[in-house]
Amino acid sequence: MNFAMALDYQSCINCKACEVACKEENGVQLGADKQRIWVGQTEETIFGKPFVNFYPSQCNHCLDAPCVDVCPTNASHFTVGGLVMVDKEKCILCKGCMEACPYDARFVDDKKVAVDKCTFCYDTRILNGETTTACQATCPTKVRLFGDLDDENGELVQLLKSRKFFVLKEDEGTVPKLFYLVPEQDENFAIRSIGHNTKIYTWDEFKPIIEKAKAKRSPQWKSM
């Protein structure tokens, strides 16, 4: 198993339903700065009128995760399916992982007295055999699709085979597993929507990157 998520981000309406569902599902601490998932935005002008692009984000569960490398206590670690997790009992709040994460996907949970982040609903859903996350299940415009990259016949891989996509900050070399689907009619939309140049991938181009990183890191993955 190698869990990941595709996002048809052009369909995001910034309704915040995913953020609310995540907090309720996972008991995330209240507060605007306490988010496992969030919706970012960029602005542009189209035909002389202002236009806002929304792009949902969260922990990318990188296959070459720098947060895991810098953690002195192994609190940040890989678990089943290549998920990056935080063991709150081992976390000493050094915040090294927060500084190492290029996606700003971590925050301090004052109740747990530990760093917190998205887990793809590992404790509440994956361990119970469920195949969707809370954010996917609640999204009214079907932005997210969670799945297993090792399942060639699964819905996620089939979608990635049919659509081009990009990942955030690919130059960091983290091999992230959030895939942002490019609008079929306009590849330049991706560049405009995030405000900088980015490489557009096909699944055949990105799959070898995934496989190389998995071969390197999978010995660290814990079993369910």
Ranges and model annotations:
Residues M1-M224:
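Non-ligating segments of multi-cofactor redox enzymes
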